[in-house]
């Protein structure tokens, strides 16, 4: 299955701004045309969203289905495409996180990777722990809305 699963807390960022992407995430991304990740500021949370180039293509198709002169389309294009960066893997599976994305997510010297299916998120570890508590509560409250459609 080609999805991003699991969380990895407290991955260190070195002095050059490099962080190692978890091996199982790299395995999913290895099937992509680009050897790296596409990263952009999350529009939902104070974190970085990342994915492969094929998911960016799906986002492009969804955004292009909107009215070309709508405020919504302009906002999505600006945030997702205008702020996105292609980050190539080095020989050790690391990427360099740009300062602008680190600042958006409040990241300094450690990150937490969180699999979200077709994307993964990169968080400041304490911010993720705080978010996880509220997400667990909401998931518990809304658990009956998740139904099998088969």
Curated annotation (Swiss-Prot):
What is one term from the GO cellular component aspect held by the record?
A: nucleoid
> Tell me, what is an example of a GO biological process annotation in this record?
negative regulation of DNA-templated transcription initiation
GO-annotated molecular function? DNA-binding transcription factor activity; transcription cis-regulatory region binding
Task: Report if keyword ATP-binding is assigned.
Answer: no
One Pfam family this chain carries?
Answer: MraZ
- What residue stretches are annotated with the SpoVT-AbrB domain? 8-55, 84-127
InterPro entries per record: MraZ, MraZ_C, MraZ_dom, MraZ_N, MraZ_sf, SpoVT-AbrB_dom, SpoVT-AbrB_sf
**Main location group:** cytoplasm
Keyword line: Cytoplasm, DNA-binding, Repeat, Transcription, Transcription regulation
Q: Where in the cell is it found?
A: Cytoplasm, Nucleoid
- Family designation: Belongs to the MraZ family.
Q: How does it assemble?
A: Forms oligomers.
Full protein name? Transcriptional regulator MraZ
């Amino acid at each position: 299955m080609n999805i991003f699963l699991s969380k990895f807390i407290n991955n260190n960022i070195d002095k050059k701004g490099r962080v190692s992407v978890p091996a199982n995430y790299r395995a999913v991304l290895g099937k992509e045309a680009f050897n790296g990740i596409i990263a952009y500021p999350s529009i939902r949370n104070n974190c970085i969203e990342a994915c492969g180039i094929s998911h960016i293509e799906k986002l492009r198709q969804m955004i292009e289905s909107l009215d070309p002169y709508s405020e919504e389309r302009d906002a999505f294009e600006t945030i997702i495409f205008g702020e996105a960066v292609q980050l190539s893997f080095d020989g050790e599976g690391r990427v360099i996180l740009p300062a602008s994305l680190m600042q958006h997510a409040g990241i300094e010297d450690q990150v937490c990777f969180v699999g979200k299916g077709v994307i993964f998120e990169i968080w400041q570890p304490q911010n993720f722990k705080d978010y996880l508590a509220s997400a667990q509560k909401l998931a518990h409250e809304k658990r009956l809305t998740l139904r099998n459609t088969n």
